Amino acid sequence: MEKTVTFYINRTTPAKLEEELVICKPLKRLTISVDVEKEEHTLMGYLVVRDEKNRIRIQKMLGYGERTIVIARHAKNTTIGGVPGPIGAGTWKIVIYLFAEYIEQTLEGVSLPFRIQISDRKTEIQETIGKCLWVDRHYREQLWLGYYNKSSFYSSRGRWYKGDFHTHTHLSDGKESVSSAMRKARMMDLDFYVPTEHNIIPTGWEDDYMLILPGVEITTKIGHCNLIGIDKMPERLPEIMEYADTPEVEEYLYEILREAKKREWIISINHPFLTIWKWKYGEVGLDDITCLEIINDPTYTDARESNDQAIRYLDFLWEDGHRIWGIGGSDSHNLIEERYKGSDKPSIAGDPGTYVFCPSLTPELLLKHVKQGNIYVSRFCTADVRITSQSKSFFPGDRMEDVERKIMMEIEIFGNELEEGITPVIWIVQNEKRIKLTTEKTKKGYRA
């Protein structure tokens, strides 16, 4: 079985392109090869394949990964983002959703061929789902992560666990393979990692050495937000991909955020003040937001100003009585040897690190303590935060009874990379007022 489909893409091409594929008899596999003139042209869009029962069998931004994609019976032979299982006879659909942001930036006055070759040939691929399959084989039209275990146990220690809530790999537009990204994550001493690809759901992971918490970055022209701890594909995600650059996207984003709240996923607003990617959607209620990304890829050229704005905005929200928690995200898209203009450091998972205190480490407990606000975000240093009152200990985010009480708070900051001659400035919000604390140097760091 062989078929070639060619799409010609320019700025006026509809955002959704679809071609039917008739499979006359069951196959062992479906092999899809993508041919473009330049490697970066694979960033033009998402590939979605639906089977004879209209079930999604793969969803992936073509990006920097392998240009040959395989759907097979088993996870070990199926490309990341795929759903393994039988290749049944009937009418399948090959769908391309164009990534409007890339089209707008690069395709002025040109039309590019986008060629897809489909066959049942056996082909070796490197980027397979791997050891851990999350997607339920008894899937419906939407993807369900029915095999993901939120009770998986990773550590019995009560401590601060370091992780990254905003990451990218070959599953969307990141330049790192999943394997390479995980090596870097271990190098950065991460305890947990959240894959948040642009409008793409991870269907599994290469191994379970580290706690991996499924997420997705809902990506539109009116802002980006992460949904963290998802157990299924958001119902309106296909419409988000199709209408991301149109006024209609507001309705679909509203529905996704309602679904996220109903299913108790974490909603985190990404880089809320970052140039063209700032948050512009005004219909979301502050009570619906769990987290605000206050440090997004600090190595990026425009990061300093936008991150400072995000931190100050979170202070304002706290002063106004809102309980929204600050988290960080590397938002890393690059290889470790690459640098943004003006930076001498790589954009890498774990920079910044977000630390979450958990009594032990499971996905379920991690989600619980993020929602409680037992969090701090850090770069180059760690913190020891001690809060006591009436002989009880508390963590950032914990609630105390609404009574008059004496509260003792001590914060110590440690780090070999703290710049010499620079003293950390520490503020707290107390009774909805921002207060600066006195800081002193110690043998190991600083204390307030």
Label each region the model flagged.
Residues 2-12, 35-78, 118, 122:
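Surface-exposed beta-strand/loop patches in noncatalytic accessory domains
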Residues 18-21, 71-72, 81, 437, ...:
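Exposed aromatic-hydrophobic patches
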Residues 19-38, 83, 92-97, 104-105:
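Hydrophobic beta-strand segments within beta-rich accessory/binding domains
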Residues 36-43, 100-104, 416-420:
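Extended, low-complexity, turn-rich repeat/linker tracts enriched in Gly/Pro/Ser/Thr and Asp/Glu
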Residues 65-92, 99-101, 448:
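Beta-sandwich interaction modules
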Residues 87, 95-161:
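Non-catalytic propeptide/linker segments at domain boundaries
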Residues 122, 135, 142-156, 222-234, ...:
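Charged catalytic cores and adjacent phosphate/nucleic-acid-binding surfaces used
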Residues 146-270, 275-288, 294-314, 335:
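A metal-dependent hydrolase metal-coordination microenvironment
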